[in-house]
Each structure stands twice: as C-alpha cells, then as structure tokens.
Amino acid sequence: EIEAVAFPAHEAGKGTVRFNETAGSMAKDSVFNAASVLRRLTGKDMHDYDIHINAIGGGNIDGPSAGTAILACITSAVTGARIRQDVAVTGEISLAGRIRPVGGVFEKAYGARQAGIRTLVIPKENETDIPNDLLGLDIHPVETAEQAFSLIFEESPIKSEEA
C-alpha cells in the first residue's frame, strides 16, 4: 500500500519530494517518470509541491511494478482526485504514460484477492498471466495511464482538452 500527501511549495518550482528510505531505487525512479506523466495529463508541475510518498509499513518496493500506483497517489495528492479503495493496480509507468509489463502479476493478484480487493488493473502485456475467473477478480488490462485512471479514480483528474 502506498500513500502520498502534497502541499504547495513555499516557493513555486522549488518543491521537494520525499520517499521512504526503504523504498527501492527503481521505485524512486518511478517518481520521476510519474512527474512527467502528471504534468502531461493534469498540467500540474510536481516541482510546485512538497510531496511525501510513503510505502505503508516501511516495505521495500523492489522493481518498477509500483509505478502506476505511485503515479495515482501523486496525482491524487496534487489534484485532490479521490482514488477508489476497492481497486489494486500494478505496472511500470513509462515517461510517455504507457503501462509496461511487470513480473509476479499472478502473485500480486492473489495478494489483492486475499486483501479483499475485487478489481485489479494490470498491464495489457500481462493479460495472459492470470487465467480467466481463477481468482474471482474483475481484471482490467490497460495500456496507458489514461485508461488506468478511468478505473482507479472516482472522477478523472485529467485536464480537459479545452483547457
């Protein structure tokens, strides 16, 4: 489980980002990918905020699989958009906002099911990793952050094209 909080920086463009020391280096790299995607989708610059990202329980996030979750948490913290609490997500986030495949998807799905989650958002390229109806989960394979956001958020945090 990952959470984030954001406050306007005291000086625009001089915000800071803090992530648990126990988070793996690849998870920390996901924060910088998320910054690019956040700006493209919402128009918000992460550097205008002081952001604290926390892996609850101080867990080590090994690898890039939390990238989409990190993006969702930062987006929620900066925009105020509410994340659905009945959805789990996995997937690496690219600079272009593509949801890239990750390892251990079946195990993550099983863990989500054990935690009472009913909806799981996974990379499209991992679609065949979980046999249909095996875990009783509503599985949504996605290719982009926009597709993931439509499932993760109660209301879209994406800026309108007209803005």
Tell me what each language-model feature is:
Residues 2-163:
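Peripheral, non-AAA+ core regions of ATP-driven protein-machinery
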